[in-house]
Structure formats: C-alpha cells, structure tokens
Amino acid sequence: SATSYSGPAAVRLLRASCGQLSHTNLYQPSGADCYLFENLAKLGFNQQLMLGHNGLFGDFLKELRSLGGMQSPLMDQTGLPVSLQAFDGSPVYEDLAVLNRWLKTEEASSNPRSATFYNTLPLHDGNHFPGQSKTADYKVRAQKLFDDLDNFFTELEKSGRKVMVVVVPEPGG
C-alpha cells in the first residue's frame, strides 16, 4: 500500500481487489467487487474483524465499514487486558490476549475457512502505560509486540490450521 497513515492503508488493503487507487479515489464510492473481504466471503471464508483498540479515533472503525466494506461485527473486547493507553486516553488491548481470543473462537467454529482483519497500535506515538503520562519507551513496546506475535504464532502453528498471516506495518511501526 502506498500510503503513510493507518486509515488509508487499511482501506487500501480492504479494497485490494481493485488495485492501487489514488488517494482521492480512495474516498469515493466503490463497487462491491473491490472489497477483498466480500470476495473472500463469496469463496466461503467467514469474515472477522478485530481491533487492539476501540476504533473511535479518526473514525477508524467507521472508515473500515464505509470505505473498506468491512461489515463484520467487531470481535468482543469485553474483559481484555489493557496494556497501554493511546495518546487520546483510550485503551490499547494486549495483543496476545486479543489474538488468543480469536484463536479460541476459530477452534470452536465449524467453518474451517476464515479471513480476519486485525489492526493494532501498541507502537503508535503517544501511547503510555496506564497511570502514566510519559510516552512509553518504544523499545519496550516493540519487544512486547514481537513477543506477543511470536507466542501467538507458536500457538497458531500448534493448532494445525492452514494460515496465511499478512503484516502491514504503519510508519514508525
């Protein structure tokens, strides 16, 4: 994706079936055939949406739905541990907990095919540990993210599921 911010990058990924759109065209209506997850649903994939945050800042969740065609319900975030607070004070959930919740849901599902969109932001500028105002050390946050991903990939491999994971980093991430 040729973009430098998470909202447009997510929309570009979700509209991948129509190729790389100009930034201006990204905010114009799109045909249903452009929506990657709709096309995957036609192939029998169950759609899922997960966020490691509440999706409210910058209307991120709203943009996923209106511009990216992502209509799946947001995975339940109730009871997820909060590892950080975002620059706007909203919760940033622990990635391993979010991902493990998804894996448990998948293991209980009767559909062996799923396509899941997950957006997380523990490396975003301005994130801080709960109860502190100083931005949390980037190295500490990066190590935690990589450890969480490594632990999750280990569990995913043990599950025996056939998977493809695509990681799209954001600037600074």
Region spans (language model):
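Active-site-proximal alpha/beta segments of enzymes that process anionic O-linked groups
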Residues: 1-130, 140
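Metal-dependent active-site segment of extracytoplasmic phospho-/sulfohydrolases and closely related
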Residues: 144-173
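Active-site-proximal segments of metal-dependent phosphoesterases and phosphodiesterases across multiple
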Residues: 127-149
